[in-house]
């Protein structure tokens, strides 16, 4: 397991595990089907799933889950990418405990993976 330590504020450090791509779909758009059933819409969601609180060591483990459907002119990509993160020095009870900058920092590796996969797939498609 590769671990990357990211300082996030004076009171918190972040250890990350490797990103995991559980689903990644590339589909050509079917405009005939869309005319009958409706066009897909772009949607990107970032959610957090709490795994564990370690009160003694002040570590919260959570999974960042990026779910997406992104509509382009000729194709649609969709899927799910996740990553386990260990927040050191802070107990987190819910996603709202993070400020916007922290949410963006937590989500960044999954978004970077999405960008990389999309670039590589669309380059050859």
Segment roles from a protein language model:
Residues 110-111, 115-118:
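Helix-rich interaction surfaces within compact, conserved domain-sized segments
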Residues 2-108, 123-124:
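N-terminal intrinsically disordered, cationic/polar leader segments
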């Amino acid at each position: 397991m590769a671990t990357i330590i990211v300082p996030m504020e004076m009171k918190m450090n972040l250890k990350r595990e490797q990103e995991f791509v559980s689903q990644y779909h590339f589909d050509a758009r079917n405009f005939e089907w869309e005319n009958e059933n409706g066009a897909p819409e772009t949607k990107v969601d970032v959610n957090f799933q709490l795994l564990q609180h370690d009160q003694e060591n002040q570590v919260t483990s959570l999974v960042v889950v990026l779910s997406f459907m992104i509509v382009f002119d000729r194709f649609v990509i969709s899927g799910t990418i996740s990553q386990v993160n260990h927040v050191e020095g802070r107990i987190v009870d819910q996603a709202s405990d993070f400020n916007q900058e922290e949410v963006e920092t937590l989500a960044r590796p999954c978004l970077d993976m999405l960008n990389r996969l999309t670039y590589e797939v669309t380059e050859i498609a």
